[in-house]
Design a protein with these regions (language model features):
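Small-residue-biased structural context
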Residues: 1-132
Length: 132
């Protein structure tokens, strides 16, 4: 089963943020596990919706802070958040139309790439500049 592995390089050095990011990685891995093992399609669909909502809420809070602090990279950062949410929606769609199995490794690669890029660059820059 594909997994997104937490790497030390994802850490931004802010304990609370690093904790939330570890939780996000855990949620994404639960998606892969549920899609592999859960037989109740409605339960999987509900879980996918919950994960999407939790990650969207985390992003909304982060984006609110960026707007309040007038962060100059806000638009790029928000666009990157939207990219992950789109990837999760793609997984939801693949589950719905029964194409997930043939695409699971591509999904895992996309998510792993997103985390490496986003945590190491965008979040690290944000937390360094704003101290959040």
């Amino acid at each position: 089963m594909p997994r997104v592995e937490w790497r030390d390089e994802f850490a931004v050095g802010v304990a609370s943020i690093d904790h939330e990011h570890r939780e996000m990685v855990g949620l994404l891995n639960q998606i892969f596990e549920k899609l592999e093992t859960e037989t109740d399609r409605d339960a999987v669909a509900d879980f996918l919706g919950e994960v999407h909502a939790r990650i969207a809420a985390h992003f909304a809070l982060e984006e609110q802070i960026m707007r309040q602090k007038k962060y100059d990279q806000y638009e790029d950062h928000k666009t990157d958040h939207e990219r992950l949410l789109d990837d999760i929606r793609d997984i939801m769609d693949a589950h719905e139309d029964d194409t997930y199995a043939e695409r699971k490794h591509a999904f895992a690669d996309r998510l792993q790439d997103w985390f490496v890029e986003h945590f190491k660059t965008r979040d690290a820059r944000l937390h360094k500049r704003l101290g959040v």
